[in-house]
């Protein structure tokens, strides 16, 4: 059925007569129909008893799906042309689509890329998560501060399909009935898998107060699936997080066991063979309770042969089935929960967790590997490592640090469990969709194979000295910058100069990612311009980031950036040469506009703190040059492109780890003994800035940088300035810069999530 037929059937109108919203709904129906047909064909060919991966994650930052699905189904060109013939534009149609608010940062975006690659590689694998009604929050700036509002994204017509699947979930004093919603995951010329999102029918979207995100955290039946990462700065918030996590894994366990029970019966096997039919990938520690929950079910419900497993047997079965991905080196992000909180929310799991801990204590004397510590806190990662068969980091450096530092006690016990799987991104969304001009030009140069085999991009290297190719790549970049400038003017009311250098830092706001260092550079540059040192090319510094509601210093950093933006915009001496923009409510849709237009990609986390990063890969693929520390996947980018095609600076991870061990880093010494550093830091509390900001916020941040600076901003600041100035100077030689751009795109193939998923499958899942 064509779009015209669907429009006629649904609205009794031609495409031309329909509104953009109506055409979007028609396209939604078209895509759902095509995916349904593909699923039916797939099911006819498929072995019902095949092994399947279940990817459990608290976040899936999937982005808008219309164009992505059309590209993956091979319909994008055909649909675009049909719309164009009828006076419609697919980009404008896509504006009618709300972005699902099911994730926040890199963790959720990685999960989305992985689902895309699992389907593209024709692997049998589904995602499992929660159907958050209001997401993290919608960010609005008011008086140069972040404010948080509910993000109502679920519409009557959406990619969500309500199913009849329901499971009972029992908490301590409460039981709820879940409801499963599905989103189809289309692979590029591949299969269709599913993202299963669990919800409750009693959730109440009206309970947030005053258009903010404060609500009664105790009304579990009304709030359970409202928000991603509800504020956990108080006891009620922490309990709600435990409710959410158990809700997710209880549903996951029931779904997995029901599917595997059917497969076992067909194969004449019992659930003690679970690992032959399922592999469960635990994405960070949020889904950890799936391990004790599976053990609970396996020891309380009879197996197919009528037997009941012992605790030991069930633990062995689960250990052979579960694999854990670690995403962090930050101690604060390795989740621990007070045992008495678990006793309140999930009392049925506590005896199992105690049993698992006793097992560990019987085998090992090192208390650092115990599950329950001396303060009666339960270490979720410890459960994953002891009772899973694989533990992977997400970049070479990250995995090394886990094995040698953070998790070395575990590595000594289980060296065979540890492995690295460097993260990747889906090139369908992050090149074919968001940078269509560049993708088309690459196809013109090297053919279409790179769309399925990203390593083919390396063929571009043969054009590194071809002036015409370099000129065209620079031209595409300039077009993308103009497009971004027009979009920012239209959507945000912000005017930016497309002739300026676009220097972009977009990621979750956290002190270790060091947006504060970039802000201090802006202050340095402001002083330089005021002193008459005018840059050859104007610079536009673009930030995009949300700060967790209760993360005070992160919100102070946003306040500083917004104040600097206003100060500079109002200064006629500086504004022609320097612009600071912070995009509101940064999300996947905004990333798709920013990344193709970027010149300098800011990846400036403190070395040893960023597990991998994936923004760095997206920018690299689209021809931005990385300005970064030797952290996460930056290390692998540097190895691939060579030192002449990346701008690196800063203390090494070994040096940083040594500073922490020796407790010998003192920000105050650097501040007091370096005039330039002192001048930049003190500007945070200057009268000039205070006229645009709040003295309390600015003073608190100023004090934090001088007295704590836990992530060593001042340690790397001067070298950061030096290397950034070098990058800006190099930008003037357009041909040389264009060559560096081409080399970055050519070497990006390694960072395809298809490569990552092939490695997961070869080494861990074995589907």
Describe the residue ranges of each PLM region.
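A conserved ligand/cofactor-binding region detector
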Residues: 1-767
């Amino acid at each position: 059925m064509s779009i015209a037929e669907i429009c006629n059937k649904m609205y009794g109108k031609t495409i031309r007569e329909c509104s953009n919203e109506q055409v979007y709904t028609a396209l939604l129906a078209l895509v759902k129909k095509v995916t349904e047909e593909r699923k039916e064909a797939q099911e006819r060919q498929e072995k019902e008893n095949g092994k399947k991966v279940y990817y459990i994650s608290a976040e899936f930052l999937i982005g808008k799906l219309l164009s992505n699905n059309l590209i993956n189904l091979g319909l994008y060109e055909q649909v675009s042309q049909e719309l164009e013939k009828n006076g419609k534009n697919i980009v404008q149609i896509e504006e009618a689509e709300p972005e699902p608010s099911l994730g926040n940062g890199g963790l959720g975006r990685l999960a989305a890329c992985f689902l895309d690659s699992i389907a593209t590689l024709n692997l049998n694998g589904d995602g499992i998560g929660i159907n958050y009604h209001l997401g993290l929050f919608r960010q609005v700036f008011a008086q140069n501060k972040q404010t948080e509002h509910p993000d109502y994204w679920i519409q009557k017509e959406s990619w969500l399909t309500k199913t009849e699947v329901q499971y009972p979930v029992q908490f301590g004093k409460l039981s709820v009935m879940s409801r499963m919603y599905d989103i189809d995951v289309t692979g590029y010329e591949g299969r269709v898998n599913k993202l299963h999102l669990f919800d409750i029918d009693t959730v109440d979207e009206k309970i947030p107060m005053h258009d903010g995100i404060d609500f009664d955290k105790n009304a579990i039946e009304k709030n359970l699936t409202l928000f991603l990462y509800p504020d956990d700065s108080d006891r009620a918030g922490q309990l709600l997080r435990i409710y959410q996590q158990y809700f997710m894994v209880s549903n996951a366990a029931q779904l997995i066991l029901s599917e595997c029970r059917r497969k076992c019966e067909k194969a004449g096997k019992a659930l003690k063979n679970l690992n032959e039919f399922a592999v469960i990938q635990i994405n960070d520690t949020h889904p950890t309770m799936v391990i004790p929950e599976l053990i609970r079910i396996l020891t309380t419900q009879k197996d197919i042969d009528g037997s009941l497993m012992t605790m030991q047997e069930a633990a062995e079965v689960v250990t052979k089935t579960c694999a854990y991905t670690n995403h962090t080196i930050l101690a604060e992000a390795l989740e621990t929960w007070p045992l008495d909180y678990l006793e309140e929310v999930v009392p049925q799991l506590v005896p199992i967790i105690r049993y698992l801990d006793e097992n560990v204590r019987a085998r090992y004397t090192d208390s650092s590997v115990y599950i329950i510590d001396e303060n009666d806190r339960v270490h979720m990662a410890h459960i994953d490592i002891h009772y899973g068969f694989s533990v992977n980091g997400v970049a070479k450096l990250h995995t090394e640090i886990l094995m040698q530092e953070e998790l070395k006690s575990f590595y000594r016990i289980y060296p065979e469990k540890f492995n690295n799987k460097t993260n990747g991104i889906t090139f369908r969304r992050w090149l074919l969709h968001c940078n269509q001009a560049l993708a088309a030009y690459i196809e013109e140069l090297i053919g279409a194979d790179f769309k399925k085999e990203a390593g083919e991009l390396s063929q571009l290297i043969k054009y590194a000295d071809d002036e015409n190719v370099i000129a065209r790549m620079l031209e595409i970049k300039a077009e993308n910058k103009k497009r971004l400038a027009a979009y920012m003017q239209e959507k945000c009311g912000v005017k930016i100069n497309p002739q300026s250098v676009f220097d972009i830092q977009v990621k979750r706001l956290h002190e270790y990612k060091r947006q504060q260092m970039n802000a201090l550079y802006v202050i340095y540059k402001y002083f330089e311009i005021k002193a008459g040192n005018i840059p050859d090319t104007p610079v536009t510094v673009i930030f995009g980031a949300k700060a967790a509601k209760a993360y005070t210093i992160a919100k102070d950093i946003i306040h500083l950036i917004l104040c600097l933006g206003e100060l500079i915009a109002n200064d006629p001496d500086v504004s022609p040469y320097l612009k600071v923009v912070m995009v509101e409510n940064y999300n996947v849709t905004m990333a798709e506009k920013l990344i193709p237009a970027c010149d300098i990609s800011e990846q400036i986390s403190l070395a040893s703190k960023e597990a991998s990063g994936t923004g760095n890969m997206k920018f690299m693929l689209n021809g931005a040059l990385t300005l970064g520390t030797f952290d996460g996947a930056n290390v692998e980018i540097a190895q691939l492109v060579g030192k002449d095609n990346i701008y690196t600076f800063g203390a090494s991870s070994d040096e940083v780890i040594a500073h922490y061990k020796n407790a010998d880093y003192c920000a105050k010494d650097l501040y007091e003994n370096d005039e330039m550093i002192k001048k930049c830091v003190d500007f945070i509390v200057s009268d000039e800035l205070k006229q645009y900001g709040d003295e309390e916020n600015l003073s608190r941040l100023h004090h934090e940088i001088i007295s704590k600076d836990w992530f060593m901003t001042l340690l790397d600041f001067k070298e950061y300035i030096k290397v950034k100035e070098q990058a800006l100077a190099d930008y003037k030689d357009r041909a040389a810069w264009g060559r560096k751009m081409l080399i970055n795109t050519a070497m990006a193939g390694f960072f395809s999530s298809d490569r990552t998923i092939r490695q997961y499958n070869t080494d861990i899942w074995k589907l």
